[in-house]
Amino acid sequence: MATKKAGGSTRNGRDSEAKRLGVKRFGGESVLAGSIIVRQRGTKFHAGNNVGMGKDHTLFATADGKVKFEVKGEKNRKYVSIVAE
């Protein structure tokens, strides 16, 4: 005979892996073309001059230079640009 009652099962106990999103290169930092600047879901930051956007909304440098964050436009959108050094 069992000396301990069988434990019930649970439907919890799972969590997804962290996706490591966020800003990877901050304002004023020097970057090379192809460097990832921001990993994001959706367009929290928009691509400015010398910045490209991947299909998962990742922003990356298309030229060498320094990172510049700015708020522009009627809707106060945040833009990331690369300024040539």
From Swiss-Prot:
Q: Which residues form the signal peptide?
A: none
Which stretches does the entry tag as region Disordered? 1-20
Any one Gene Ontology MF annotation carried by this entry is: structural constituent of ribosome
The record's Gene Ontology cellular component field reads: cytosolic large ribosomal subunit
| A single GO BP | translation
Which InterPro entries is this protein grouped with? Ribosomal_bL27 (IPR001684), Ribosomal_bL27_CS (IPR018261)
**Pfam families linked to this entry:** Ribosomal_L27
Keywords per UniProt = Ribonucleoprotein, Ribosomal protein
Q: Which PANTHER family match?
A: LARGE RIBOSOMAL SUBUNIT PROTEIN BL27M, RIBOSOMAL PROTEIN L27
Q: Which family does this protein fall into?
A: Belongs to the bacterial ribosomal protein bL27 family.
Protein name from the UniProt record: Large ribosomal subunit protein bL27
What taxonomic classification does the UniProt entry list for its organism? Bacteria, Pseudomonadati, Pseudomonadota, Gammaproteobacteria, Pasteurellales
Gene behind the chain: rpmA
